[in-house]
Amino acid sequence: MGRIFTRAIVVITMLVGADWAQAASKAELWPRWQKHDPNSRQQIDHSVWESFLKQNVVAPHPSGVNRVRYDGVSPEDQKSLKSYLQALQALAISNYNRDEQKAYWINLYNAFTVDLIISRFPVASIRDINISPGLLARGPWGAKLLTIEGEKLSLDDIEHRVLRPIWRDNRVHYALNCASLGCPNLQPRAYSAGNSEALLEKGAREFINHPRGVSLQKDKLQVSSIYVWFQEDFGHGAADLMEHWQEYAEPALAGALEKYQGGLAHDYDWRLNGVETKP
């Protein structure tokens, strides 16, 4: 089984083209963000983001993909969201402990993504917001629109140069939301030092047990492109990927994965995760 599955992974990886470049970035540490204070007891207030999520995220949604009411966000909520983002950027995040930092970066990424969509709505896909530098760049991920401790950062920086290399926790992929139907769910809760572990576990379980994550379709294993783009985060090969899926799979899926010996296909739905978008 291992040889067949690995061969499928390799073939698929070779097929990933330039169109997916922003999603296939390597984890490359930005050393200055390693600074932290393990003795700090300071807590960051994410209540504004929590309130926004409860008001504007539809969860659960019949499709199994949490949705955002982008077109229904009130002017007051828009203003509060921008104030929250300004407050996060004003923090000296290096003075906080690792748990507070992890929640901070996840919330910053998600809140800023939502703000980008709202400010440019209506859009059919986040990839239509072409503000990243570079001739082949697509989407907003490379645009350095945030300023933290005097440094300009992009969404790509947060994901690939801070969160992934510092924490080395593949569940981060289930926490970051790219405003698309193919993404793991945007949780209706803000991350915090106290709830991050539970939310990361919840996100992994929800995604893997939904068809956009992992599913068997007509004797073919269909998985999210996340597992191709970021295969290195999930281990050294097909066996590690399978072990990861089985760890979170419900009994029926886990049993099917254990017996599976076929090929693999991957895809990703970049349509906006708005309330009106049909699956």
Annotated model-derived regions:
Residues A24-P279:
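Interaction/scaffold regions that mediate signaling and macromolecular assembly across diverse proteins
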Residues D19-A23:
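Sec/Tat signal peptide C-region and signal peptidase I cleavage site
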